[in-house]
Amino acid sequence: MADLLAFIHTVPSLVGLFTSLAQEILPADVEVLHIADEILLKVVLAKGGLTPFIFQRVADHVIACERAGADAVQLTCSSISPCAEPAARLVEIPVLKVDEPMVDQALLLGQRIGVAATAPTTLQPTTELVRQRAAAAGRTVEVEALLCHGAYEALFAGATETHDRIVHEHLRTLMSRNEVVILAQASMARVLETLPTAERRVPILSSPRLAVERLRQILAGGAGA
């Protein structure tokens, strides 16, 4: 029986990105299903953080995925990453945070880590995850987090060039002071396509590809689960 992977999104536009990555990286017989729930991010932004409603709704989605036959669930939004552990206790399949592989790779690349975000609700979860993973690995890190004010609003207004310009400006600042920079949201991965390679003074990591590569390892029975 073919493996089935479930992706839970808060931004519908990410369905296409993760579908493409799954087709490129995962075995051909792996099936994927997507749940795109815009309400999650809208409530998180409106409330300024996670609420019991969000934890319950994510858990409901995860349980539904397991009942549909999913072998693993991948959350694709850093804002809801803290919901992974509580939801995982309710099922018998892995529930994965999208940014863990990215953070783990960043820890291998430097001690000074810059975090760029366009949504304010992702800064704290991502920064905390860096510190948690560093502590688990026995590493000492310095974390600098910057919010790209106006970029998120520009993206959802369709002003992608404005979004990219704002993010690029903040990336240049972070690159000047850190050894590696991570993008706190999967929706930010697009900026790497428009940032000239010559300007990348330090590695800049995004989460989508690394997350799907970890899924491939999990399906193969390797580390990462």
Set out the residue ranges of the language-model regions.
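Non-catalytic structural scaffold of enzyme domains
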Residues: 1-225
